[in-house]
């Protein structure tokens, strides 16, 4: 349901109108929930009700404390139903750069939010011919100790968030300011038993309290974190080269939030964050062929910092609670400077560092939003949500846009001379959305929704949705949802200045005329679209809980490197462009079970995911490589009020590589048949609180030392680290 007319939304005018209307009718008697964090809840909105749908999981601060991530929040997020870690394609490149994948839709269809605001630093990293980025993703900007909760939204419930949420949404909520002065200092270390695996050290602090009574409060945190790279030879040499192990990372973060309670019914938040994230190079090249690096450059860089991201964020948010409902107005700015060593962009050296010179890609995002929740009960009990969003993103990446040098060649309407191609691209999206949380009678909730987005390049897109929940009695509930979701083209795919090339082997398998290919950006792409459906049955009574959910995503228009010729360059090479592909299907089952073995003492929680189907209907290959099934099981034992332990077990099913050739090189060289067989990982976590302000933790991950090594034969493999020991302490006041 895409529309390409010239209609333009003016969201800033909408925001100003909402602000004027809201401030005119402030209520003095708004009720609070009595919590220190000043989060006020007036009415149950559609957004709140959607978080009760079967495709939603909540990770609490207590969950994180009991099962602490080693370095990245993805360590614990991956244990939710429907979630895995993988690359954005099935071709096996960048095997250890695994990001959050939800329901098999790939990391590029997972939208990351921090306090409800989109985070997009990973989009400053070049997008490769095969659809990968050399990035760790956006799940490592908040230290684990500073997280209040994480919401994992899968399927139709994520549609309200717009572009990029076709798989789902990860919403990371940081801790709010408190009414009394509190502070903490946390230390954490993870020490692998295998000396070839990188260890981790992390320290962070927080300070929170009133600056002027309860009218002005603040929260400040800082974080230092270092995870070393795996040894250069952790994996066996194949084809004359090593597949790199896991890259190391250094994080430095500082974040501040000041909250001003202007009146009992109005709160204004000011936020600022600065992060520096640098890598510790482990030798990875896009195609694991560092042995052909000129002068041995790749080998010489092991252990060095070859890329670093500087991320800054500014935010201003107004929350109002009125006689007619509540409102939220927000403006956020995010700037990412991505500084890295220059790399190749053609053929087998694409993505390989080829210079000792650094270049910087800059990505800026401006995001404004307004939302009002209005309860109505004249004829039927309901809460209507009206909202508007505006987002402007602009990219300046001179290195990636000029890396392919074809001086003197005319490629369609574009010059092959880098100096003639622009390094910049930008896009603006404006949106209006409507939702209604309707309770026609006791036990029934209906949530219709409609979102309209207008993109400066591809035009308009309608995203309707409908979710419902029906109480069946005796503890059973039936829940279902359907939504049309979309993803806009990224700024590399749609940039006229972004040129990639290959001398022949990288051309699509259907092109066999013996010459090379150029791949151009395309300003006429359509949005990717997926119709997501789910149906779930849940049971909850006396501490017991169980549920099973079927989901299906019918995906089309996925943007891929082109296979259709659009012309011939002046040097006789074929001209391709990024294009909208055909259809794909993702289908599966999710299940969960909670058993209170001993009430308030011993709980057993299990969730499982089984993939029925994941394939591109044109190529026959999966969208991404994930296990056929995944089971996560946790036994939580509260031994005393101060002492608790958790035993966790994860079983990953077989992971098969893609089977069908996509490039000419794969015709001449047989594709890898290497697959990762089913395996399990067991962990033990211990937590002890000496006082309410001093606690310690420790444990063992991968107790039985099951290791997986990455292979260098083109398969989608990765390193699963072996047994490791961790310890941590938190001191507060």
Each language-model region and where it sits:
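Short, acidic, small-residue-rich periplasmic hinge/interaction motif at the N-terminus
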Residues: 26-66, 107, 115
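N-terminal periplasmic accessory domains that precede
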Residues: 73-76, 98-101, 113, 137-140, ...
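Extracytoplasmic beta-strand/coil segments of soluble accessory domains associated
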Residues: 74-121
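Short acidic/polar hinge/loop motifs at secondary-structure boundaries
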Residues: 118-154
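C-terminal beta-signal and adjacent terminal beta-strands/loops
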Residues: 122-125, 556, 561, 651-663, ...
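Periplasmic-side early beta-strands and strand-to-turn transitions of outer-membrane beta-barrels
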Residues: 178-301, 557
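Gram-negative outer-membrane beta-barrel transporters
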Residues: 186, 439-445, 550-555, 566-661, ...
């Amino acid at each position: 349901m895409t529309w390409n007319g010239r209609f333009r939304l003016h969201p800033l005018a909408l925001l100003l109108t909402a602000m004027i209307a809201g401030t005119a009718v402030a209520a003095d008697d708004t009720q609070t929930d009595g919590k220190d964090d000043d989060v006020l809840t007036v009415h149950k909105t559609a957004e709140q009700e959607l978080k009760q749908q079967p495709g939603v999981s909540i990770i609490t601060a207590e969950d994180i404390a009991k099962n602490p991530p080693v370095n990245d929040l993805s360590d614990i997020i991956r244990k939710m139903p429907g979630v895995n870690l993988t690359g954005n394609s099935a071709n096996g490149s960048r095997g250890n750069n695994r990001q959050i994948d939800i329901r098999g839709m790939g990391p590029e269809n997972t939208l990351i939010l921090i306090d409800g605001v989109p985070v997009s630093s990973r989009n400053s990293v070049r997008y490769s011919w095969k659809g990968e980025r050399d990035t760790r993703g956006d799940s490592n900007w908040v230290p684990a100790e500073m997280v209040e909760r994480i919401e994992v939204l899968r399927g139709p419930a994520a549609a309200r968030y717009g572009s990029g949420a076709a798989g789902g949404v990860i919403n990371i909520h940081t801790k709010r300011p408190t009414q009394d002065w509190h502070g903490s200092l946390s230390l954490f270390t993870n020490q692998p038993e295998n000396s070839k695996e990188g260890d981790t050290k992390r320290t962070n602090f927080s300070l929170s309290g009133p600056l002027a009574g309860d009218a002005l409060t603040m929260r400040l945190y800082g974080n230092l974190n270092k995870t070393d790279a795996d040894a250069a030879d952790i994996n066996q040499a194949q084809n004359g080269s090593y597949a790199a192990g896991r890259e190391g990372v250094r994080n430095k973060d500082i974040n501040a939030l000041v909250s001003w309670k202007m009146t009992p019914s109005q709160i204004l938040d000011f936020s600022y964050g600065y992060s520096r994230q640098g890598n510790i190079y482990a030798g990875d090249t896009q195609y694991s062929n560092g042995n052909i690096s000129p002068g041995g450059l790749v080998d010489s860089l092991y252990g060095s910092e070859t890329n670093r991201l500087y991320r800054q964020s500014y935010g201003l948010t107004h929350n109002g609670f009125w006689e007619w409902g509540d409102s939220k107005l927000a403006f956020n700015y995010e700037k990412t400077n991505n500084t890295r060593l220059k790399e190749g962009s053609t053929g087998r050296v694409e993505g390989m560092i080829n210079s000792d010179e650094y270049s910087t890609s800059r990505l800026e995002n401006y995001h404004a939003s307004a939302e009002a929740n209005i309860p109505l009960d004249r004829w039927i009990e309901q809460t209507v949500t009206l909202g508007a969003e505006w987002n402007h993103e602009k990219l300046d990446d001179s290195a990636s846009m000029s890396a392919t040098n074809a001086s003197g060649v005319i490629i369609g309407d574009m010059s092959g001379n880098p100096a003639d191609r622009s390094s910049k691209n930008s896009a603006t999206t404006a949106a209006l959305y409507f939702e209604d949380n309707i309770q026609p009678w006791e036990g029934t909730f209906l949530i219709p929704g409609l979102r309209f987005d207008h993109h400066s390049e591809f035009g308009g897109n309608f995203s309707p949705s409908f979710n419902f929940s029906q109480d069946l009695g005796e503890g059973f509930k039936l829940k279902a949802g359907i939504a049309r979701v979309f993803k806009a083209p990224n700024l590399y795919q749609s940039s006229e200045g972004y040129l990639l090339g290959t001398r022949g082997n990288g051309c699509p398998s259907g092109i066999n005329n013996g010459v090379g290919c150029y791949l151009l950006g395309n300003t006429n792409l359509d949005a990717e679209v997926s119709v997501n459906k789910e149906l779930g049955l849940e049971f909850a009574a006396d501490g017991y809980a169980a549920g099973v959910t079927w989901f299906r995503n019918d995906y089309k228009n996925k943007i891929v490197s082109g296979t259709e010729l659009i012309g011939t360059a002046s040097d006789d090479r074929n001209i391709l462009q990024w294009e909208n592909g055909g259809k794909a299907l993702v289908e599966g089952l999710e299940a969960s079970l909670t058993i209170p073995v001993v009430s308030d003492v011993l709980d057993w929680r299990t969730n499982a995911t089984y993939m029925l189907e994941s394939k591109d209907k044109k190529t026959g290959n999966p969208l991404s490589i994930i296990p056929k099934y995944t089971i996560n099981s946790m036994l939580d034992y509260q031994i005393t009020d101060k002492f608790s332990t958790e035993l966790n077990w994860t079983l990953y099913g077989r992971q098969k590589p893609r089977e069908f050739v996509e490039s000419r090189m794969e015709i001449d060289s047989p594709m890898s048949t290497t697959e990762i067989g089913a395996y399990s990982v067991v962990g033990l976590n211990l937590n002890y609180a000496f006082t309410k302000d001093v606690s310690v933790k420790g444990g063992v991950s991968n107790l039985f030392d099951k290791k997986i090594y990455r292979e260098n034969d083109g398969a989608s493999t990765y390193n699963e680290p072996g047994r490791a020991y961790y310890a941590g302490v938190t001191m507060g006041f």
